[in-house]
Protein backbone atom coordinates (compact mmCIF):
# COMPACT_ATOMS: atom_id res chain seq x y z
CA UNK A 1 0.00 0.00 0.00
CA UNK A 2 1.05 3.54 -0.69
CA UNK A 3 2.10 5.36 2.48
CA UNK A 4 0.22 8.46 1.36
CA UNK A 5 -2.65 6.75 -0.45
CA UNK A 6 -3.78 4.58 2.46
CA UNK A 7 -4.38 7.54 4.79
CA UNK A 8 -8.07 8.54 4.98
CA UNK A 9 -9.00 12.16 4.23
CA UNK A 10 -11.05 13.79 6.99
CA UNK A 11 -14.04 15.78 5.73
CA UNK A 12 -14.48 18.94 7.86
CA UNK A 13 -17.89 20.35 8.81
CA UNK A 14 -19.49 22.38 6.02
CA UNK A 15 -17.78 20.37 3.26
CA UNK A 16 -19.55 17.83 1.05
CA UNK A 17 -17.71 15.35 -1.16
CA UNK A 18 -19.52 13.44 -3.91
CA UNK A 19 -18.15 10.82 -6.30
CA UNK A 20 -19.99 9.96 -9.52
CA UNK A 21 -19.79 6.48 -11.15
CA UNK A 22 -17.44 7.98 -13.80
CA UNK A 23 -14.93 8.81 -10.98
CA UNK A 24 -15.69 12.56 -11.05
CA UNK A 25 -15.03 13.98 -7.58
CA UNK A 26 -16.92 17.14 -6.57
CA UNK A 27 -16.00 18.97 -3.36
CA UNK A 28 -18.22 21.82 -2.10
CA UNK A 29 -17.23 24.04 0.79
CA UNK A 30 -17.51 27.54 2.24
CA UNK A 31 -15.07 29.05 -0.30
CA UNK A 32 -16.50 27.40 -3.43
CA UNK A 33 -16.72 24.20 -5.45
CA UNK A 34 -14.07 22.10 -7.21
CA UNK A 35 -14.58 19.23 -9.65
CA UNK A 36 -11.94 16.85 -10.98
CA UNK A 37 -12.02 13.62 -12.99
CA UNK A 38 -9.86 10.90 -11.44
CA UNK A 39 -8.28 7.85 -13.11
CA UNK A 40 -10.71 4.92 -13.59
CA UNK A 41 -8.32 2.38 -11.96
CA UNK A 42 -8.61 4.15 -8.60
CA UNK A 43 -11.67 3.68 -6.37
CA UNK A 44 -12.84 6.54 -4.16
CA UNK A 45 -15.29 5.76 -1.35
CA UNK A 46 -16.93 8.02 1.23
CA UNK A 47 -17.32 6.43 4.67
CA UNK A 48 -18.75 8.42 7.59
CA UNK A 49 -16.69 11.65 7.72
CA UNK A 50 -13.75 10.56 5.58
CA UNK A 51 -12.76 9.77 2.01
CA UNK A 52 -10.88 6.51 1.38
CA UNK A 53 -8.84 5.99 -1.79
CA UNK A 54 -8.08 2.42 -2.94
CA UNK A 55 -6.67 0.89 -6.12
CA UNK A 56 -8.12 -1.96 -8.17
CA UNK A 57 -4.83 -3.93 -8.46
CA UNK A 58 -1.09 -3.64 -7.81
CA UNK A 59 0.12 -2.69 -11.29
CA UNK A 60 2.97 -0.17 -11.23
CA UNK A 61 0.87 2.64 -12.76
CA UNK A 62 -1.95 2.10 -10.26
CA UNK A 63 0.48 2.14 -7.34
CA UNK A 64 1.78 5.54 -8.45
CA UNK A 65 -1.74 6.89 -9.09
CA UNK A 66 -2.89 5.81 -5.62
CA UNK A 67 -0.94 8.43 -3.64
CA UNK A 68 -1.46 11.05 -6.36
CA UNK A 69 -5.25 10.68 -6.29
CA UNK A 70 -5.35 10.89 -2.49
CA UNK A 71 -3.25 14.08 -2.58
CA UNK A 72 -5.44 15.64 -5.29
CA UNK A 73 -8.64 14.98 -3.31
CA UNK A 74 -7.00 16.29 -0.11
CA UNK A 75 -5.88 19.46 -1.94
CA UNK A 76 -9.47 19.98 -3.11
CA UNK A 77 -10.81 19.64 0.46
CA UNK A 78 -8.19 22.05 1.85
CA UNK A 79 -8.83 24.47 -1.04
CA UNK A 80 -12.57 24.82 -0.41
CA UNK A 81 -12.05 25.26 3.36
CA UNK A 82 -8.88 27.38 3.68
CA UNK A 83 -7.84 28.28 0.12
CA UNK A 84 -4.32 28.63 -1.25
CA UNK A 85 -2.03 31.58 -1.81
CA UNK A 86 1.39 32.21 -3.34
CA UNK A 87 3.35 35.36 -2.57
CA UNK A 88 5.71 36.96 -5.08
CA UNK A 89 8.18 39.83 -4.67
CA UNK A 90 9.42 42.24 -7.33
CA UNK A 91 13.10 43.06 -6.79
CA UNK A 92 14.73 45.75 -8.90
CA UNK A 93 14.79 49.47 -9.57
CA UNK A 94 11.58 50.57 -11.31
CA UNK A 95 9.87 47.17 -11.00
CA UNK A 96 6.29 47.88 -9.94
CA UNK A 97 2.91 46.17 -9.86
CA UNK A 98 -0.56 47.71 -9.84
CA UNK A 99 -4.12 46.47 -10.12
CA UNK A 100 -6.54 47.74 -12.77
CA UNK A 101 -9.83 46.04 -11.98
CA UNK A 102 -9.07 42.31 -12.10
CA UNK A 103 -6.00 42.89 -14.25
CA UNK A 104 -2.44 42.93 -12.88
CA UNK A 105 -0.15 45.45 -14.61
CA UNK A 106 3.60 44.94 -14.17
CA UNK A 107 6.39 47.39 -15.04
CA UNK A 108 9.44 45.16 -15.45
CA UNK A 109 11.88 47.25 -17.45
CA UNK A 110 10.36 46.36 -20.83
CA UNK A 111 9.33 49.09 -23.27
CA UNK A 112 5.70 48.29 -22.42
CA UNK A 113 3.81 47.29 -19.26
CA UNK A 114 2.92 43.60 -18.93
CA UNK A 115 -0.81 42.98 -18.36
CA UNK A 116 -1.96 39.72 -16.80
CA UNK A 117 -5.67 38.84 -16.67
CA UNK A 118 -6.90 37.05 -13.54
CA UNK A 119 -8.13 33.59 -14.54
CA UNK A 120 -11.46 32.28 -13.26
CA UNK A 121 -11.04 31.27 -9.61
CA UNK A 122 -7.89 33.35 -9.01
CA UNK A 123 -7.54 36.83 -7.54
CA UNK A 124 -4.59 39.17 -7.07
CA UNK A 125 -3.79 41.30 -4.02
CA UNK A 126 -1.03 43.87 -3.72
CA UNK A 127 0.94 44.81 -0.63
CA UNK A 128 2.66 48.03 -1.64
CA UNK A 129 4.00 48.16 -5.19
CA UNK A 130 6.38 45.22 -5.04
CA UNK A 131 4.53 42.36 -3.31
CA UNK A 132 1.90 40.30 -5.14
CA UNK A 133 -0.35 37.66 -3.56
CA UNK A 134 -2.12 35.15 -5.82
CA UNK A 135 -5.15 33.60 -4.06
CA UNK A 136 -7.62 30.89 -5.01
CA UNK A 137 -9.17 27.56 -4.06
CA UNK A 138 -7.48 25.43 -6.76
CA UNK A 139 -3.86 24.73 -5.72
CA UNK A 140 -2.82 23.77 -9.25
CA UNK A 141 -4.25 26.94 -10.81
CA UNK A 142 -2.77 29.26 -8.14
CA UNK A 143 0.67 27.71 -8.68
CA UNK A 144 0.37 27.95 -12.47
CA UNK A 145 -0.63 31.65 -12.39
CA UNK A 146 2.18 32.48 -9.93
CA UNK A 147 4.64 30.63 -12.17
CA UNK A 148 3.38 32.54 -15.24
CA UNK A 149 3.93 35.86 -13.44
CA UNK A 150 7.43 34.80 -12.33
CA UNK A 151 8.35 33.69 -15.86
CA UNK A 152 8.12 37.30 -17.10
CA UNK A 153 11.33 38.19 -15.22
CA UNK A 154 13.04 35.32 -13.41
CA UNK A 155 15.57 36.41 -10.76
CA UNK A 156 19.04 36.79 -12.23
CA UNK A 157 22.04 35.54 -10.22
CA UNK A 158 24.24 38.68 -10.27
CA UNK A 159 22.07 41.40 -8.72
CA UNK A 160 19.02 39.31 -7.79
CA UNK A 161 16.68 41.45 -9.92
CA UNK A 162 13.42 39.89 -11.07
CA UNK A 163 10.24 38.32 -9.72
CA UNK A 164 10.81 35.74 -7.00
CA UNK A 165 8.66 33.73 -4.64
CA UNK A 166 8.57 35.18 -1.13
CA UNK A 167 10.64 32.42 0.49
CA UNK A 168 12.82 31.63 -2.54
CA UNK A 169 16.59 31.80 -2.08
CA UNK A 170 18.43 33.05 -5.16
CA UNK A 171 21.83 31.51 -5.77
CA UNK A 172 24.10 34.49 -6.29
CA UNK A 173 27.20 34.60 -8.50
CA UNK A 174 30.23 36.81 -8.31
CA UNK A 175 30.82 39.25 -11.15
CA UNK A 176 33.97 39.55 -13.21
CA UNK A 177 37.11 40.29 -11.22
CA UNK A 178 38.77 42.45 -13.88
CA UNK A 179 42.44 42.74 -14.90
CA UNK A 180 45.11 43.59 -12.37
UniProtKB/Swiss-Prot annotation:
Gene3D superfamilies: Ribosomal protein L6, alpha-beta domain
PROSITE patterns in the record: RIBOSOMAL_L6_1
GO cellular component: cytosolic large ribosomal subunit
Record has Signal as a keyword: no
GO annotation, biological process: cytoplasmic translation
GO function terms (MF aspect): rRNA binding; structural constituent of ribosome
Coiled coil: none
Keyword terms of this UniProt record: Ribonucleoprotein, Ribosomal protein, RNA-binding, rRNA-binding
Role summary: This protein binds to the 23S rRNA, and is important in its secondary structure. It is located near the subunit interface in the base of the L7/L12 stalk, and near the tRNA binding site of the peptidyltransferase center.
Record's subunit section: Part of the 50S ribosomal subunit.
Family as reported in the entry's similarity comment: Belongs to the universal ribosomal protein uL6 family.
Protein name: Large ribosomal subunit protein uL6
Amino acid sequence: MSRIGRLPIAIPNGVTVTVSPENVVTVKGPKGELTKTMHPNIDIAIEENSVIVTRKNDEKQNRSLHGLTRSLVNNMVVGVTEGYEKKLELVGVGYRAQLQGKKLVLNLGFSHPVEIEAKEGVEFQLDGTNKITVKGIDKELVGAVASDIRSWRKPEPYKGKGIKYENEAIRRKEGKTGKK
